[in-house]
């Protein structure tokens, strides 16, 4: 598995859980001897939803809600089989979406 890299993208609504998960992945990869690049913060997606407060009229009275999706990118360069096994056994919180590309 030399001269390869593993690219890990993390997504979450809560940035504190996301940063803790990224730190767990980085220290797990470093403990197995792989070189780690990141975590690199990617742009935050902000979805804004506007609804009317009243049911029938008063269009000037609106309320806005937003959902922010925070993202991080981690590259693991020259991973060993030991690194891949350690990453597969890693327990991360339920609010974090993980996308791994080899």
Curated annotation (Swiss-Prot):
Similarity comment text for this entry: Belongs to the universal ribosomal protein uS10 family.
Subunit structure: Part of the 30S ribosomal subunit.
Protein name: Small ribosomal subunit protein uS10
Gene Ontology molecular function, alphabetical: structural constituent of ribosome; tRNA binding
PROSITE patterns in the cross-refs: RIBOSOMAL_S10
Family matches, as Gene3D superfamilies: Ribosomal protein S10 domain
Pfam families per UniProt: Ribosomal_S10 (PF00338)
Gene symbol of the encoding locus: rpsJ
Main function: Involved in the binding of tRNA to the ribosomes.
GO biological process: translation
Organism, as annotated: Clostridium perfringens (strain 13 / Type A)
